[in-house]
Structures are given as C-alpha cells and as structure tokens.
C-alpha cells in the first residue's frame, strides 16, 4: 500500500483537536483555538466561524449532517446548523473533551469532569439528563445499535453506560485512553484454523500471549462507588442478553502504547487489566487478589507510539498520535501490518502549508494497468518514501542522528490529535501546529492467474481464489500481511513478510485436468460467472483449499511463480528455484540484462518451465533442472507481457511501445535433442517468419552462462497490432487472441479482428478469455479502498459472440475449395480444411445461430468431410439431412460426391444450382422438388458465405455438365457461370458481394423455341401478360407490376432441367408439378402461362379466377377464339359472334373445343358475380349461348337488344314478357306489368304477382291500394273459377286473402303509432316512445289504442278467419264477380245481418273504426319468451302500453309490466317514473302514495345530508333534457327525480316497502382519488360517528364544523349544487376516517358503466352510501338493488320468505 500526501491546509496556530465530516463527505469541520473551520474535499476553506468558547476542544456532527455541536474549556455545548447558525445550548461545570451522537441520531452524549449529559435530539421539550461521573472523560464511542455507549477517561477507566444513565460495566486500562471505537464482531477477520508457529525474531507479525487474570483497580472501585446506584445485577444481565452485547467489541488504544480488544459482555466490576500481558511478574504474591475473567480481553498488542486518535476502515485500524506516525493494524488481533507515514515538522507539506500540488498529483498517480507477471524492484515503496522524506527533513533541520521511525519519538514536536477517513481512500490528519494534512492511500493489487483459476488479495490479510468459468470461490483468511501470491493447477502459494504458505485444492476433477473448460460451466449453471448478488450462488459448492505447509523463511522477490513441487522467486537480476522445503535447487543470474516479465508455461511435474522476457527484447524459457535457458526469439523492444496459445503454436509479445507481435512457437521438427555439439542447420529457403531455436549454444547473457545467444538477428513476427496494452490467448479456442487497447478489446483470429467491444472503464484489460466469455479486469477500483475488495467489482464478464469466428473459418474453408482445381477433378479433403472445420465446430459449440451451423455442414459436405458433416448435423438435430446423407452414401454410384454437393447446396437455399446438379445426376424427381424453392428474380441469398458457395456450385456444374450440353444449353451454362461471381469477403465485414444481373442475351433463343411450339394464342397471351395492359380493371387488377414470362428465372431453369428428362412423360410431369406449385404459391400469372404452355386453357382460367386476376383474365379471353358450333337453323349473325381473323379455330367435336367451352363458362360466371356485365356479354357472345346472352341483357337493362334477340329467337318471347313485367313492377307501373303477364300466357303467375304487389303496398303503408289489389286478386280467383274447376291453388288464394286482411289491420295500428311519433315527438324511432309525457293521459290515448291493436292481433286468429268466411263462401259458390271494395262491403253487411250483436262482441273483430276496450288486455297471454308478439314489433312498446292501460285497474298486470320494463333497463327519464310506480304497486298495495303526502310522514321528513324538509312522497313533474341526464347517472335505489334535494342536490334513498326516507348519503371519491384507493380506505379505520351527531340526532352542518378534521361533515361536499343529483365528494383521508360499519359499498349493475367510468371496477359501477345514524337498521337486497328499513324487511321476509320486490329467497338477515 502506497501513501502520499495530497494537500495541506494551514487553519491556525493552535492544535487541531477535533475533525468531523458530513456523511456524504462534501463538508468537513476542524476545531482550532476558538474557531471552527469549514472546508471541502477540494480542498477549499468555505467558512471560518468564531465561537464563544475560549478553546474548542471537541466537535460532533449528527448522522444526517444537519447539526454541528462544538464544545470547549468553558463547559458550554453549542448546537449549530450546517450554515453556522446557533440553535440552542446547555452547559457543564467543567471543560468538555468528549461528545458523540448516537448512530441513529436520536441521542447526544457529552462528558465533562464530574457529570455526563444525555440529550434526546428528537424531543425538543426534553431537558438534558445529567448523570454524575468521576474522572476526566477523554473519548466516547456508541454501539452501532445506539443501545449503549463507552466512556474512556484520563485515569484509564472504561465505563459502559445505557442512554438512561445506568452503568453496565467498567474496567481500568492503567493509562489514559484517547482513542476508542465500538464495532461488531462480524467485521473481524476469521483466523485460520491451522495453528502457525511464528518466529518472533524474523517476523513483524508477532503474536502475544494473553493471560486471563486481572488485578482490581483502586481508582476504578473508587469511581464506581461515587456514582448513582441501581439494581445492577438483575438489570445488567437482562440488558446484556436482550441487546446481544457479546456480538460487539471495544477497540481502545491507551498511552501505555497498547492496543486492546475488549468483550463488553464480560463483567469486570472496575478491574484493572493493565498487566494482563506481564507474564513474567510475580503472580504468587498477588494471587489472593486476582479473579478469573475469561473472555474479557480478546486481544492485545503493542504499538510504537502514544496513540491519540483512531479511525477504522473495514477490518483495519489506523492509529496516530505523539510523534506524527501513522500505522495500520489488524482490528481483530492488533498486529502492525504496515507503517504508513511519518509526519516531519520540516516536511514541505507542513512547513509550506497550505500546499495543493497540481502537477505532482498526476505524476504520482499509480499506474492503472496492473498486469500479472511484471518484475519490478522489491524494496517496499512506503519505506523508501519514508526514508527519502526523513533525509530531506533532517537535512533541513541539520540533524544527523535519527532514530527508527517505528520507535517512540519523544523529540518530535508534531502530534496528531485527530483523524478522519474520506471516501474513497484518503485520510485527513489534524496536527498540533494547526495544519491539516491529507494522505492518499494507494492499494497495490496482488493477484495471480492460471487458466480459469484466479487468486487475488482481499484487503491486506485475505486471499480469494475463484474459478472464472464456474464461479466457484474460496476465501482464505491468512491473518498476516500478504505480500505476494501465485497459483498453478491445484497449488496455491502465499508469501508474507516472514514465511511462505502453501495450500492444495481438494478437487479430484481439477487434478485430472489443468484447466476447467467453459463447457463445465454450461453443464452446471445458466447465469454466468459474475453475479453481484452472492445469494444466487449459495447452492454452488465453493473451492476447497487445505493448508499443506509453511516455509518459515523470509523470501525477497518481485514475482512469485509456483509449480507442483517447486516455486520460482523472480527478481530483476536473477531467478531462483526452491522446493517446498525451502531448499534452492536452481538459480539463474543476469548481469547485463534485466528481467521484465515472467510467466509459467507448465510442463512435466518437477520439470516445469517459465517464459521470461527481458528489457533487450529477448524471450527465453527457463526449465527446472536445466541450467541452460532456451532462447525463443529476439524482439526489437523491451518486453512488457508474454503469452502462449494453448496448442503451443504461437506466442504473443507486448512491448513498451504498445505493440503486440505474434510469433510462431517451437516446432517439434526444429528441436534437436541428444548431441550437445549439434549445430542447427538452416536451409536457404527457410522462412524468416519462423522462430529458430539456439539449443546448447555456448554464449550466455553476460558472457559466462551458456544457453542464450547474443546475436542481433531480430525475429520476424507473423503479424502485429499497434496500440495494445495487453494480449492473451483463448483457453478453449487455439488461435484466438484477445487484444486489449486503452478503450476496447479486439478478438483476433490470424491477422484479422472478428469482434470488438468497448471497455466500461478506460485502461482495463482482458484477464482471461475462455471461449465465448471474456473476463475484464476493471482498474477503476485499484488503489481506492482498503475494505475487502469483491471480485464482482474487479472482474467484469463480457459475452463474446462466436458467430464471427465461425463465419471466418467457414469462409476460409470455402475459399480453399474455390481455389482448388475443379476442372481436374481434385480430391477436396485436406488437412488444412479439416483443421479449420474442427476449430469452427469448437467455436460453434459455445453458441451460434442455426445459420452458422448449416454453413459449417455445407462446408464439410463440399470438402467431403462426411464425419464432420454428420457431427454438425447431429448437433443441430437435422435428421432429414442425416438420412439423405445415409441414402446417398449407401448407393454405389460414381456421382456420390455430386449428390452430396447438391444436398449441401439445397441446405443453404442454393436451390437452382442444386436442382441442376440433381438433374445432371439423373435425379429428376429431386430436381423438380428443389425447383419449388426458387424465386423468379434469382435474388442473391442473404448469407456471408453465399457468394463463395455460389461460385463453388457453378464450378461443379461446369465440370459435370460441360461434356453433355450443347447449343443453347451451353449458353445457359455460361450465364450461370457469370451470375453472382464471388469475391473474397474480408474478416470482420458483414457485406456480401452482390450477384451480377442475369444476362438477357439468351431470351431470344427461348422465345424462338417457344414460338416453334406452334400455338399463336399462347404467344399472344404471353406477350399480353408481359406487357401488362393498364386498361384492364376489376377487383383483382394485376397491373401494379409487370410480369415477363420469358425472363422468369424459374421457367428458364425448368426448361434446362426438362432437357435432362429421358421420356416425354417425365417432361410432362415436371411441367405439371411446377405449374401446380406456382399456383399454390400464389404465382398466378406464372402458373397460368405454364398451363397455356402445355395447351390447357381451362386450368389457366381456373388459376386466374381463383386469384381474381381480372386484368390478366380479360386479356386471355379476348385472345381465345370463339367456341365452334353447328347451327341447326339460320339465325341472323352479329358482329360480336365473328371470330378474329388471326384466331385459330377448333373443330366442334375436338377436345380443345370442349376445354375452351368450359373455360368460357367459368370466366362468364366470374364476371357475372363481379357485376361486370359488359365483359360477361362479350364472353357469352364468344360462347354462343342465346339464353345466357338474354339473361345478361335483361340484367344489364338493354331492352332494345332484348327485343332484337326475341325477334331472332321467337321461342324466347314468353320469357322476355315475364322479365319485362318484373321490370315494370319495380318501376311501379302495375297495369303495364299485368298486361305483359297476359302476353306471356303464364296465367298461373298472375295471382302471385298480384300478391307481391299487395305486399309492396303494405310495406309502403298504402292501405287503399292494398284493398284495391285485394279485390283484383278476388276477381282473378273468380275468373279462374268461372272457366275451370276449382283447383288446389285456389284454396291457397283464399288463405292469402285472409292473411292480407289481417296484416292490413296490424299495420293500420302500427301506422297510428308512427303517426303519433312523428306528430308529437318528431321522431320515427320507436325507442323514443319512452319520451312520452305519461302524466297527461289524454295525449297518450292514441298510443294505448295502437298498442292494443298490436297486442291483440296474435290472439285473434280465429276471429279473423270467421270474418272472411262469408267472402270465401261467395267465391266458392261463384255467385258473382265482385271488386275488392264490394267484396269487403258485402262481407261486412252479411256479417252484420247474419250474426247477432252478442256474437259480434264475442268475436271482437277489429276494423279501422273499432275502438278497443282496456278490459280485453287482462286476458292476453304473451308468455315469457314473447312467442305471440308479431315479428318486427318492439317488446318495449307492448309493455309500456300494458303498464299505462292497466294502471289502478289491474294491479297484477301493471306489476308484471313494470317488472319487465325495469328488467329491460330502459334509458332516459322514464326509468325514474317506472321505479316509482314499481314501489307504489309492490311496496304499499293497501295505500295510495300517488301524489299526496303520506299520513306516515313522521318517519323521516328531512334530507339526511342538509336536514332540508322533504315531503314523504313528492308529486311527479314533467321531465326535461337536463333531468334525463341527471336521472341516467342516479343509482338504481334512488327512485325518482322528484326525490333529489333542492337544497344540497343529494338524491334521497327510500325504503322499497314503506317509501320512508332512509338516513343514507350518496358519496363519491374526488378527482385525485381513484376508485381502488377509495375502496381500500373505506374499509380500513373505524370512527365513532355518534359522537359527531347533534341533539336532533342529525348531522350538524355548522360553519365551525366545516373547518375541523373531525366528523362526517368533513366528508360531505362543501359546495353542493342544488338539483345536480351527485353525492358528497370525499378525499381518500376522509374515506379512511369513516367507520366501515357505516359505509355501504353497492354494485350498481343497473346503470350504464360508460356514464361513470371513474367509478367502474370490473365493468360494474361502485356506489358508496354513508349511514348518518349508526344505530339505524338497514338492509340492501343485491337481487333488486333496493334499500329497505331493516325492521320492515325482516317482518316481510319472515312471513313470505322472499324479497318483496324481486322475490329472492337466498336472504341472510
């Protein structure tokens, strides 16, 4: 640990007795003289505050930093805020030198001579509690839990007290104690279990024996006798047990130069423990006065000066005091770990204060780059700096003889009175001359790494060993200062100042393998290594290291290297080897060279070797047992670091110029063994890039030691990288180099960079590269803290993608294949390709996408590496490809390699090349299947290696097909050769070379071949498809892009493959399959062209119709010739039927003609469905079918052409007349339509058309026309009866007449309803009938009458039949031919004449003049499902009419109708009216609450919210638009609009039985309170509401009450709006204050959730009702949604067993 002064400040001439800082370290306070100086970490003095104290002796600051307390010799204790303003003060009788805040900030303790003051900071009203105290207090320390504190005095007493002033324990140290702390035991280091014998003569880590006897102190007993007495025995034991005082330790340093650790839970009763370490004293003379105190004194040690101040950082104690020395101790045992600094009076930082250096600050910063293996000078840095400063200081003072700085310096005038720690790594000392000195603590990193094992020093006395791959960790508590360490396989060596400790790893799996592979990690964990949360790895077993031996010698070295049975001590000028007994076995000395770097490279046990770099650039190997080093290479610059690849092929060298060079390591062929005088022979053509070995050369480094040559022939590296800080080789993937720069890390393969990632902190470097994980050493934490460093802070894991590495090696293999001589038929498998594929598989196993695996399999198949290809395919689970390989290799064919190559091409989507290869190997079936995967543009495949694969495939095609292709096919081959020519893609780039465009020079050849096929129609269509005419339109217009059949790459390839077919059937099968594939792939135009290419127009039409390619279909049918036909009669010809001159004619009986006819019919159906009649007529003309043409002309409305067609075909005239009649009917020309029907001669349809006319007149409400048409129908029936016998159809006519008359009656009533809606409400919407003002019965009489018409219709079927009986008899007897009006009149007269009045009243026949009676409504049975209601009639209209008609006359019918109306949940203002009527009918059947006041008004006649008077049942009034909006948002249980209070606007809630006003107030949350919070707060806290009620037992709404926070009035809305119908608006706090027993939370399922979205929970509105009288009994029924008076409801339920409103039976009272 390196310590340097950062700055100094001169704050006064008097000593700085106290230093404090805020928790965040932004402000610090120093006490000097009578001034308190405030300064920052900069440093800069921000304020100097002069106090009233003659001398400030002590400062204290609260844990939150808001209060600063100053104390002085006058005994005053002054509290100030952070700005210096005085808050309050209190006084002691004598000076105060000790004070402290409790850790939680609640208590403050100040101690003076004679008393102790305890102040409660959080209670300003509490006075200071004074306790008597004997002695001169010097320090106070609180326990971490603020439960007790310790006071040390000038007499050496330690007194433990509680905040209440009770004394728990005390002891005497025998000397003044100014430095005091209390810590928890968990912060102590755990000592190793193995006992270590310490040689005191050779070690500074001395251990002291602690006798367990003490001598009572007279001063202690005297002090305790003068204090306040308590029941100490009982209280002390209870307090110690309850507060776990055994888990704490008191750390104290006294003036007898001793450091002690004391257990506060052991009772000492003032005993003196000063001589517990005097083992040589005569104990027999004092044995009677001693008592056994087990466990009181935990540890004791000596310190080299009188301590005055103490600071704790982690597990270490920093002490300073008389003489200005600063030392660091082990907090658990007090060992002096290091002497950090010595303050000299003549030091420039002291004598020239203030001193804030600027340039030296950056000059003395430690080097951030900490690379393992660097060799430096072994002298301790702090000792060297201390000696240098001592010489400078003594030279200034002219003092020659200076004693050891670790001894007591009485001559020193500089004392350190105070000390504070400032994060992250600074100490500020307060000196006796008024100077503040800041020291910087720089923590040196001691670590070692071997493979995946990494060991580093935690703090100063612990070593952490971890496996980077698995995350397993082991922490070794050494207990001594760790100076160096080394790890190798299962051996760990730790060097301290006095010995060397050896540990062994107890892991059998690791003993078998030197390095744990990264694959071990994947088999055991899925979360990676670096986990900041250690709890995630608790279930993982840790590394188990056992102590083996201790070599008790003091070794001096800069770098320690350990092997299985030896260890290397490396220094700048020599390297020595020792066995585990400490005996030296080998030694190499360098006189002219300086060793700069050492790295272990392993070897045979007991013959391990190290790799050593020198400042001259030499790199050598030193091997145990071999006196002659081996020179590997000579570099041009001094060596900084070295590394060797795992396969021992390459060595990387990093020099001082930040350049990494990669050399080839030793080859077996270059090593000559045996003869010592053998010279190394080098051929003239030996490459200089390979390193040479100078074995047994008789030239040494200094001229004496043989083994290393001195020639200046520098070795030539394979490649270099600049700007490199470190470089290491991958442990799993040989040949992969991790190169660290200042800001990033490059993953290199050969001379290229495959992946780069940025460093989170500049200057960090790769510690270990293990496959796909890079472990980064973070240098940002170096030298900043002495607290135990955790590996999660030091090491960062970065995932390295393996895909670039796999792509590079696969690309390299493919490049090898491309450079091979394919034309000569070279054998592809080679050793180089095998090596690259194996390395690629290793990288792929660490995780790459599926595409990389497929590229690997393709490269293996193209390289003829079947075993590797099977391995890759098995890894990704490609069973299909494995089976294909097995089938291909099972065949004995000379084209096996060709088939494997075709399989590889098909796997990477190079289907065109693969299909040609399969076709060339006589596998047309497979070639056809691959043809399905080819696009028409031949787009280059999106793969980094696609370009190379295409080039390799095309070379294979050229070699295999060159001999069998001629003419046009060879030209196609040339196109394939030039298409997509590949270029080499550099490593690290993701861009693939673009393929060249397809050469179109050969299109003419294919078009000529197509023309030679002999069909002009196909040629025309292909040309039309290619041109893409823009005139075509329709729903599937395909003119967005043009399609060129001749440039379709699939068609070109299909023709090329078809040339390899041996038979015509194979060729036809290929075309059919490809055409069907194009059709299923939605390639409609390509499929249609393919079908035409094989003379199948029907299939082409099907394809275009299915795809709705209207434009292409239209172009095709215009090109087709007309259907050939044989005419049996001479008919006039039309130009549309003429065939084009250049069109081909088929024979009428030919297969082609039949196919063409079917194609035309399919196209005709398509255009007809699309309402494209112009094109449909054209197709019908080509088809030659006059009936179809007639139908289309009629649908089109071309009557002139229809008439002309009728003249040409007379047999079609009846159909033309009927069609014309239908058209006239649609136009309303009924007489002309009937005339056309008579001309058609189809009299059977005349009556049907008349009936259709009647239906149309009824639908249009033209009832006079309906009666006339009914008479016309009767005449038609009579005419039929006069000329022919009565048929069965005549009976149907009679039934039709009956139904027509019934419908006339029904729609007459319906017309009355509509007339009323239009005249009164100005609306034709039947749902608006609820807007009728029902209180005016005269205005609703017509509606009631109309409703009775509608409801009575279905119940009078028999009456209607009897009414038409006379008319039916006249028709059957044929007594006369009557008109429609005469028939109706005669029927009425005959009915009046023959039937008596009683019969007519019984029948109840309804005519337009009949007025219905209300009494008949009681006998109508509509049923639950409303099966008897006429279709199209609203059920709501019927129930409203029934409710109005039966009011006060038929209560049961009215109740039933009202229930159905409420169940329908009608919107608008009618809901309030019907709720009221329902309550009147069901609630009080014996009373009438219609409009007057109730006689029982004494129950509740006031508003429960504002106490405004209300009527028991107010009368109803007209409802306006605003009222409708208010009623829509009212709860279901608030019956009518008239019950809204006019004063406060609250809706009234009535009992559904007696209509009493219930003491319920509607409430709702405010805008800032959500419904969820309101529901939660409403059921949380109970509150007494009765105490808030007035004498009138109502809520008092006084002004004073509104200003308080108590009472229900606070929850009522303060500014209510009269008539708004809203409830009281509450906040969440007000909801919480109301008792849950007085809040009713109701689910309002009757209201529309969209009206009140803020109150909706689960699509249901939540309502809050507050009961204002807590003892009033209420009941709420969830079935009907009404509130009831509790007593009334219970009486009714007990009698009937159900709810009086909804009839629910599952009621809980």
UniProtKB/Swiss-Prot annotation:
Subcellular location: Cell projection, Cilium, Flagellum; Cytoplasm, Cytoskeleton, Flagellum axoneme; Cytoplasm, Cytoskeleton, Flagellum basal body
Taxonomy, superkingdom: Eukaryota
Chief localisation class: other
The keyword Protease belongs to this UniProt entry's keyword annotation: no
Cellular compartments per GO CC: 9+2 motile cilium; axoneme; ciliary basal body; ciliary pocket collar; ciliary tip; intraciliary transport particle A; non-motile cilium
Swiss-Prot/TrEMBL GO biological process terms: intraciliary anterograde transport; intraciliary retrograde transport; intraciliary transport involved in cilium assembly; non-motile cilium assembly; protein localization to cilium
Region (Disordered): 209-229, 1378-1404
UniProt WD repeat ranges: 51-89, 132-171, 634-673
Keywords: Cell projection, Cilium, Cilium biogenesis/degradation, Cytoplasm, Cytoskeleton, Flagellum, Leucine-rich repeat, Repeat, WD repeat
Matches recorded under SUPFAM superfamilies: WD40 repeat-like
Reported function: Component of the intraflagellar transport complex A (IFT-A) involved in flagellar assembly.
Protein name per its UniProtKB record: Intraflagellar transport protein 122
Species of the source: Giardia intestinalis (strain ATCC 50803 / WB clone C6)
Source species taxonomy: Eukaryota, Metamonada, Diplomonadida, Hexamitidae, Giardiinae
